[in-house]
């Protein structure tokens, strides 16, 4: 009830404060110059933009002293622009198609004559935006319905955008969550995708704020935009932003149903001899996939109240290639049950409605609610099914929004809006009745392969990741200026518990126990965040030049409430006071861009943009500083199972070596010591402490002929202000270097047998002594260093997944002809350098510290087409040629192998020596970004047939064919050097992606409209 009251209070506050636009950061517009027959500018001309997409029917402006006009905040749609002035004939421009975020240059040439005389001009829609500098891809609902898009999702933007990476998918077979999740997406080396609905952030509040729980229903999408650069000061995005522009209904009732279906019999087997040689017994198989949307829209009251509603039922079930259930579950052994293949199953139920109400001539209210339940059984990761994220029940969850738009005059516009994204992500221990897992089953990791079985590493009964967002803005528009200022505010709630079966995990090496991990579970952490941003910007047209400039002031604040924990097996009862300002960061972020209409005809534009963007953050930064987490929640100790009973025969509460167990590797474990891990107070507050990136772009856009345009560009980004972790109890002098000889293997460089040096082990006297401080990285930089990244931070967030320096080039073409033919695509390539060559604690940090991702690893070719055929047939398709993933060889070297070079046993051994010590160290046998899998080529096709059932009822029959060539490209392999090295496995780092491209898939679909 407390959250409900808060939600209602915030909604009321927003409505009383001001008003909000549906277009937000992707506002469209029409602008231009009005002239007379002699070429002189005409002030005082009334310019009206009319469209069925506007519930108010028409928006207007008046040209200024330079003859310029500017109509902003228009919805996507088809417009008629009318120019009228006493003493001149009225001029109409018809068929102006606006996409989201596009400003169409529509100039008016007026002749002397009677006002009643109307001259109608029908011409091609402008394709070059000479006003804006943002780099964006706009995908309309019409285009998605035309192309082979499977279960329509955010992944479709990745398929159509050269340079964008994401989850490989064949007709929706990768699942509902992964095709809608932004976590795996990057663009030109940048990660941290912000997903917005109607201009408001809807991602979960936990972690770095880059994951989703709520799944947008694409039936509501009029258009979806992807901004990849040149983003204005209005946006708090970290460099990449997706925004769904929702449908509103209209003055005509429309009803319909969209559906698709496929089954196991329609999915081809693509198992090849090459895959069998890699140890693959079977590839992934779609058992069923369905998606049904029932939609309705129209007027509740014509010209006043519109509605649009959609009810979605969708689901999928797939086998996971090469993986089986455990026939000996509940024992220390994994025995593949060849009669039970691992599977992944998901289903979603969603019911949503949007209402748009023209309150008065100047005020418009929009309300949206979508309540859904999303369910998951199995993840498809490289783990035994019993140890995967087994039973996600994301219910109830949903998205609830309200916005108000107030056009005070043809120059003044007020906007405001509010959103409540309810994201839940619990994955509880499933119990003995589900997938045969008992709470007594201990999670086991086989170190030689990286394979986990018997139980999940950790479980969560509570994962609340709620996000509340608000925004407001004021726009003042003249013919030459579009001034806008306002703010966005977000509040995040993240409650998450942690449970571990038996409060321990086991690690085996080739079936022999060698490590036990202890946890202070169960516990519940509470984290909170607030993100506020204020901006001011202007778009200034000076003859052919348009300047876009603005400034943002961002303030990110995280805190945790008071928390109490009961005593657990390995920890005493603890109480912690509330902690504020962890961190409290302020930043000033300039944005600048310029667009020059080279010939003054709106057909060629030269563009430049530069901006400072902040790392994406969520409540995870509060979690880092939460005193519960800072007290050390888990620690490792070696384990020599001398009696072979697969149970650690030692006193685990004794942190010193005893029985079969060595000493704990962190002496803070189990103690009430919130200072064991902490942030340097100097970087927790103030200006400019947050990691940021600069992003610049130069582009040339040219309309080759009516209906065809091309873009060529150069793009560069780099990040700065890194954080790093310093264990203040040790120095580089406390480490001893060693080398390891690589195994002899023809698959290794030179056949193996070479030495890998640069490894280091801490002195035994310092083992377990930890006092970690997260601090600025730059004091550790050597003179003349070229550091572009560190191990803990990057513009994508706290994990440094996308930091460094990137240079990219892009050439793309887009066309749409009056005949209905559409063609598009492009080539994108680039190079990324990540340099982390500095030492904080261990000299080993210099090993492979400079990584270059070459052009060949980032060159993409993408294209799409759509051709109307006779008899209401249509043929369309997409093609992608993408680079293969990189892979490495991480070798778990034993103490015996290491001691030869180290001159002693590893520090983790304690009093054990030689083979009696089961400690290991991971040795990288291959330098990152030097070995790659084969490139992937994927062709998807669609054939449609329009059928007129009655005068009002139409059916479109759809036949889709995905992965036409039945390619079996390997997408990810095991990078742990051992018996399973280079075997195709799911990429667990991004939630498990199919290791092999699924085979040819046939889908049947239909769209019914009346």
Regions picked out by a protein language model, each given a short descriptive name:
Residues 969-1010:
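C-terminal beta-signal and terminal closure region of outer-membrane beta-barrel proteins
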Residues 64, 88-248, 267, 274-285, ...:
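Periplasmic N-terminal accessory/gating domains of Gram-negative outer-membrane beta-barrel systems
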Residues 254, 284-375, 393-420, 590:
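Transmembrane beta-barrel wall of Gram-negative outer-membrane proteins
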Residues 154, 167, 179, 562-589, ...:
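Solvent-exposed loop/turn elements at secondary-structure boundaries
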Residues 662-669, 673, 677, 779, ...:
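Extracytoplasmic gating/loop element in the C-terminal half of outer-membrane beta-barrel translocons
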Residues 2-140, 201:
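Periplasm-facing N-terminal accessory domains of Gram-negative outer-membrane beta-barrel systems
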Residues 556, 711-888:
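Gram-negative outer-membrane beta-barrel transporters
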């Amino acid at each position: 009830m407390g959250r409900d009251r808060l939600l209602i209070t915030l909604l009321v506050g927003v409505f009383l404060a001001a008003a909000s636009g549906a277009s937000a950061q992707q506002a469209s517009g029409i602008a231009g110059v009005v002239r007379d027959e002699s070429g002189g500018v005409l002030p005082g001309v009334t310019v009206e933009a009319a469209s069925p997409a506007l519930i108010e029917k028409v928006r207007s402006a008046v040209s200024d002293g330079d003859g310029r006009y500017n109509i902003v905040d228009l919805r996507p749609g088809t417009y008629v622009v009318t120019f009228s002035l006493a003493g001149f004939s009225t001029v109409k421009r018809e068929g102006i198609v606006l996409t989201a975020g596009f400003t169409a240059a529509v100039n008016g040439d007026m002749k002397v004559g009677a006002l009643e005389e109307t001259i109608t001009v029908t011409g091609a829609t402008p394709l070059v935006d000479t006003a804006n500098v943002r780099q964006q891809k706009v995908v309309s609902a019409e285009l998605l319905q035309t192309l082979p898009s499977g279960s329509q999702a955010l992944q479709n933007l990745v398929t159509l955008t050269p340079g964008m990476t994401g989850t490989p998918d064949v007709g929706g077979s990768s699942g509902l969550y992964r095709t809608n999740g932004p976590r795996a997406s990057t663009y030109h080396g940048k990660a941290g995708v912000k997903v917005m609905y109607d201009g408001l952030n809807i991602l979960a509040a936990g972690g770095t704020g880059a994951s989703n729980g709520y799944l947008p229903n694409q039936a509501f999408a009029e258009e979806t935009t992807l901004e990849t650069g040149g983003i204005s000061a209005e946006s708090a995005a970290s460099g990449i932003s997706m925004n769904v522009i929702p449908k509103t209904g209209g003055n005509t009732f429309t009803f319909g149903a969209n559906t698709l279906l496929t089954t196991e019999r329609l999915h081809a087997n693509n198992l090849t001899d090459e895959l069998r040689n890699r140890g693959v017994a079977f590839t992934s198989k779609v058992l069923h996939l369905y998606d049904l949307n029932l939609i309705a829209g129209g007027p509740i009251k014509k010209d006043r109240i519109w509605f649009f509603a959609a009810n979605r039922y969708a689901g999928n079930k797939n086998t996971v290639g090469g993986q089986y259930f455990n026939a000996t579950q509940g024992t220390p052994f994994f025995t593949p049950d060849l009669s039970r293949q691992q599977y992944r199953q998901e289903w979603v139920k969603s019911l949503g409605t949007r209402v748009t109400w023209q309150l008065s001539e100047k005020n418009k209210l929009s309300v949206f609610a979508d309540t859904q339940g999303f369910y998951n059984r199995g993840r498809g990761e490289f783990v035994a099914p019993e140890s995967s994220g087994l039973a996600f029940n994301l219910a109830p969850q949903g998205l609830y929004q309200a916005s108000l738009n107030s056009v005070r005059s043809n120059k003044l516009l007020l906007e405001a809006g509010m959103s409540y994204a309810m994201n839940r992500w619990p994955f509880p221990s499933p119990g003995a009745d589900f997938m045969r897992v008992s709470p007594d089953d201990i999670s086991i990791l086989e170190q030689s392969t990286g394979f986990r079985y018997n139980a999940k590493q950790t479980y969560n009964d509570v994962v609340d990741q709620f996000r509340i967002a608000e925004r407001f803005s004021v726009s003042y528009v003249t013919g030459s200026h579009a001034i806008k200022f306002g703010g966005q505010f977000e509040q995040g709630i993240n409650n998450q518990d942690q449970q571990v079966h038996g409060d321990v995990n086991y690690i085996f090496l080739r079936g022999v126990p060698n490590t036990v991990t202890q946890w202070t579970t169960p516990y519940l952490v509470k984290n909170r965040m607030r993100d506020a941003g204020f901006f001011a910007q202007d778009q200034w047209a000076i003859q052919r030049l348009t300047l876009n400039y603005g400034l943002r002031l961002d303030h990110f604040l995280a805190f945790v409430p008071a928390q109490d924990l009961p005593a657990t097996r390995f920890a005493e009862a603890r109480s912690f006071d509330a902690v504020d300002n962890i961190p409290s960061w302020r930043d000033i972020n300039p944005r600048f861009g310029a667009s020059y209409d080279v010939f003054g005809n709106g057909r060629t534009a030269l563009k430049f943009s530069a901006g400072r963007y902040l790392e994406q953050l969520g409540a995870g930064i509060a979690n880092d500083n939460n005193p519960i987490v800072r007290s050390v929640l888990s620690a490792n100790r070696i384990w020599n199972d001398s009696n072979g009973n697969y149970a650690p025969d030692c006193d685990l509460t004794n942190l010193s070596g005893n029985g079969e167990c060595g000493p704990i590797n962190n002496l803070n474990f189990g103690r009430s010591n919130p200072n064991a891990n902490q942030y340097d107070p100097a970087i927790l507050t103030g200006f400019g402490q947050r990691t940021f990136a600069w992003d610049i772009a130069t582009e040339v856009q040219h309309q080759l002929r009516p209906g065809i345009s091309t873009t060529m560009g150069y793009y560069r980004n780099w990040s700065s202000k890194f954080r790093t972790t310093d264990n203040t109890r040790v120095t580089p002098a406390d480490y001893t270097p060693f080398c390891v000889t690589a195994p002899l293997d023809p698959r290794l460089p030179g056949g193996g047998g070479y030495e890998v040096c640069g490894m280091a082990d801490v002195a035994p006297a310092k083992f377990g002594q930890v006092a970690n401080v997260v601090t600025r990285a730059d004091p550790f930089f050597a003179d003349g260093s070229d550091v572009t990244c560190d191990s803990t931070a990057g513009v994508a967030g706290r994990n440094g997944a996308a930091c460094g320096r990137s240079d990219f080039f892009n050439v793309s073409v887009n066309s749409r002809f009056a005949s209905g033919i559409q063609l598009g695509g492009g080539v994108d390539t680039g190079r990324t350098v990540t340099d982390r060559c500095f030492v904080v604690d261990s000299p080993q940090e210099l090993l492979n510290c400079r990584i270059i991702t070459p052009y060949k690893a980032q060159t993409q070719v993408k294209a799409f087409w759509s051709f109307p055929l006779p008899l209401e047939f249509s043929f369309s398709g997409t093609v992608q040629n993408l680079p293969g993933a990189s892979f490495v060889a991480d070798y778990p070297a034993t103490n015996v192998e290491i001691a030869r070079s180290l001159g002693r046993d590893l520090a983790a051994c304690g009093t054990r020596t030689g083979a009696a010590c089961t400690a290991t160290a991971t040795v990288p046998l291959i330098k990152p970004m030097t070995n790659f899998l084969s490139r992937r080529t994927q062709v998807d096709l669609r054939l449609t047939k329009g059928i007129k059932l009655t005068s009002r009822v139409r059916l479109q029959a759809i036949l889709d064919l995905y992965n036409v060539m039945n390619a079996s490209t390997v997408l990810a392999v095991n990078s742990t050097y051992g018996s399973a090295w280079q075997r195709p496995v799911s990429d667990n780092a991004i939630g498990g992606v199919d290791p092999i491209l699924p085979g040819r898939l046939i889908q049947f679909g239909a769209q019914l409209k009346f």
